[in-house]
Amino acid sequence: MISACLINEDDSLSIIQITPKEPLPSDVIWLDVNQPDDEERQWLETLFVEDVPEEDEMDDIESSSRFRVGPDGVHIFSLFPQRLSNETRGVNMSFTMRKNLLISFREDDISIVRLLRYYIRHNKVEIRSALDILLKLQDLKVDQLS
């Protein structure tokens, strides 16, 4: 599933679902890719010079693979806490940051992403750029860990 966060002319935000048959709207600042199917992966390949991140790449724990700059932008792999009953486990997310487009990839549902999407839908967060989205996700992660 691919969700897109768009910044509107009045600086409000909207979240919509994107299908591979549609062109990418020009006002998208965040593409959130959750468990993409083959058709979605093929569509995403058209947006990248490099390969779209695979689940095994996101699970690589080498510190040298957590951050790099490539032809598609800045690539960041980050571990997010996910609470399941009384347990907390780490779930990896991959981010590609471009000039004003953040593309996130995940293979699991992550409560912090759900929380940010809730804040966006209910205008409870001030976001003006793709970088703001990335920073807010990291901020929410720190809040949850503390």
Across the structure, where does each feature detected by a protein language model lie?
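Peripheral, non-transmembrane regulatory/ligand-interaction domains of membrane transport proteins
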Residues: 1-146
